[in-house]
């Protein structure tokens, strides 16, 4: 297996313009495909997940052109539900941001479509979404294991009264919200259980509004969506930088700045993961906010004990930042780490122990006490982009770190290690 050894880094300094947000890119692509008119998307993320969405849209007859660097996409909308040219199978890799929204959107009208993906995708639960779509009339079959992809979709979704479980993934609610306006009937969506990753719902509502559709949101417990609507292209749309990707650079600034400035997100950003900067501030770093930048300057870091439900992806970065903080850090209410690209709670606990940390892994929390000195280890990445990027921070010590399968960062940030090296002064 390919590996990359990062030598100790003395200082991290400088600015980085972030690649586009994965969450925003794939939502914007789907809405542009469903909309009336042409949309020019700029700062689109070029990554595996986005390529899977683009390939699916192409197979569904959507016309688009990409710039040479794949960060601008001019897409001609379908002016309504997507139509398959006949029976179709779409392979979506391990892209949850493609699988969940497409599973809902392709239940409009009369298609026959199979959605499948990599082996890990077949372990990522989708039963709560399927249950909700069936309540709205959708015909869906599981082709292998009950509650998991691959799925066969045969249309039939008309709207109506729907319940959705919000406790596993906010993407199920996102998928229903984006699909419901195109259903023939009005839809009332009731959320049961605690809604995880609520800020991601704000991204969805924000984008729907940009494409001309507003819905009634009653305290994130009930959403009322008028049926028979259309999405309308905003013409041009700039995808903001990926706030989860920003977390690694901001953390590096907190640990070994200098000052690190990330551009493409800021106080006006719609992504909840910008709140990651507040956590670094609580730990002792200095944060400066602009409309389209966040800067982090080094401070003496101390441990925290926090509920991380609102920023589950960026919270992973705090787990490795904790290696540089004084005391024991506890991250709580993060059960949904277990249903991501890998079981991230298990993976994080396992790899933190390899570098010498004392770790307690609970059902929905992790407790981390750093060692006096970090140990050089080969870090397994579990085909999970965030594991690779999180553990790169270990090199901000006097110990090297070896990352196995470093190219797995292609899911959201193909040139991550090059960018980190550009801003680093070797020890």
Swiss-Prot record:
Keyword Signal in the entry? The reply is: no
- Species whose genome carries this gene: Salmonella typhimurium (strain LT2 / SGSC1412 / ATCC 700720)
The record's Gene Ontology cellular component field reads: cytoplasm
UniProt binding sites for phosphoenolpyruvate? 22, 96, 124, 171, 344, 386, 411
EC number(s) given by UniProt: 2.5.1.19
Pathway in which the depicted protein is active: Metabolic intermediate biosynthesis; chorismate biosynthesis; chorismate from D-erythrose 4-phosphate and phosphoenolpyruvate: step 6/7
Which family does the record claim for this protein?
Belongs to the EPSP synthase family.
What Gene Ontology molecular function terms does this protein carry? 3-phosphoshikimate 1-carboxyvinyltransferase activity
UniProt record, GO biological process? amino acid biosynthetic process; aromatic amino acid family biosynthetic process; chorismate biosynthetic process
Q: Where in the cell is it found?
A: Cytoplasm
What keywords are assigned to this protein? Amino-acid biosynthesis, Aromatic amino acid biosynthesis, Cytoplasm, Transferase
Q: Which gene encodes it?
A: aroA
What mutagenesis or variant effect is reported for residue 101 to S?
Answer: Confers glyphosate inhibition
Subunit note: Monomer.
Q: Which HAMAP family match?
A: EPSP_synth
Catalytic site positions: 313 (proton acceptor)
Catalyses: 3-phosphoshikimate + phosphoenolpyruvate = 5-O-(1-carboxyvinyl)-3-phosphoshikimate + phosphate
Please report the name of this protein according to its UniProt entry: 3-phosphoshikimate 1-carboxyvinyltransferase
- Source species, domain of life: Bacteria
Q: What is the recorded function of this protein according to its Swiss-Prot or TrEMBL entry?
A: Catalyzes the transfer of the enolpyruvyl moiety of phosphoenolpyruvate (PEP) to the 5-hydroxyl of shikimate-3-phosphate (S3P) to produce enolpyruvyl shikimate-3-phosphate and inorganic phosphate.
Instruction: Cite the binding residues for 3-phosphoshikimate.
Output: 22-23, 27, 169-171, 197, 313, 336, 340
């Amino acid at each position: 297996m390919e590996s990359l050894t990062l030598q100790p880094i003395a200082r991290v300094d400088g600015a980085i313009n972030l690649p586009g947000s994965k969450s925003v890119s794939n939502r914007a692509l789907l809405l542009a495909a469903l909309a009336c008119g042409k949309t020019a998307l700029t700062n689109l993320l070029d990554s595996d997940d986005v390529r899977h969405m683009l390939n699916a849209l192409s197979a569904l007859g959507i016309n688009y052109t990409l710039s040479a660097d794949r960060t601008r996409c001019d897409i001609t909308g379908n002016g309504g539900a997507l139509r398959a040219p006949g029976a179709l199978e779409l392979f979506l890799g391990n892209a949850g941001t493609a699988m969940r929204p497409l599973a809902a959107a392709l239940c409009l009208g009369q298609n026959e479509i199979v959605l499948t993906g990599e082996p890990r995708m077949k372990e990522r639960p989708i039963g709560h979404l399927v249950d909700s779509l069936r309540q709205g009339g959708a015909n869906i079959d599981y082709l292998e294991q009950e509650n998991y992809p691959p799925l066969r979709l045969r249309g039939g979704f008309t709207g109506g009264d729907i319940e959705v479980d919000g406790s596993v993934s906010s993407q199920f609610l996102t998928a229903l919200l984006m699909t419901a306006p195109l259903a023939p009937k009005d839809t009332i969506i009731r959320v049961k259980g605690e809604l995880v990753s609520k800020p991601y719902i704000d991204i969805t509502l924000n984008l729907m509004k940009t494409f001309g559709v507003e819905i009634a949101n009653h305290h994130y417990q009930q959403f009322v969506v008028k049926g028979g609507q259309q999405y309308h292209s905003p013409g041009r749309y700039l995808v903001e930088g990926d706030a989860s990707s920003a977390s690694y650079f901001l953390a590096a600034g907190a640990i070994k700045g200098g000052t690190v400035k990330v551009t493409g997100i800021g106080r006006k950003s719609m992504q909840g993961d910008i709140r990651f900067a507040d956590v670094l501030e609580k730990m002792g770093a200095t944060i400066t906010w602009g409309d389209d930048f966040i800067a982090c300057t080094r401070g003496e870091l101390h441990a925290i004990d926090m509920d991380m439900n609102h920023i589950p992806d960026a919270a992973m970065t705090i787990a490795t930042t904790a290696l540089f903080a004084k005391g024991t850090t506890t991250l709580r209410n993060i059960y949904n780490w277990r249903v991501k690209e890998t079981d991230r709670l298990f993976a994080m606990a396992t790899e933190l122990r390899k570098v010498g940390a004392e770790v307690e892994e609970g059902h929905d929390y992790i407790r981390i006490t750093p060692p006096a000195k970090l140990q050089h280890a080969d870090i397994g990445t579990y085909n999970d982009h965030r594991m690779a990027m999180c553990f790169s921070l270990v090199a901000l010590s006097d110990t090297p770190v070896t990352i196995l399968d470093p190219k797995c960062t292609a899911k959201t940030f193909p040139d991550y290690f090059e960018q980190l090296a550009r801003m680093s002064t070797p020890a």
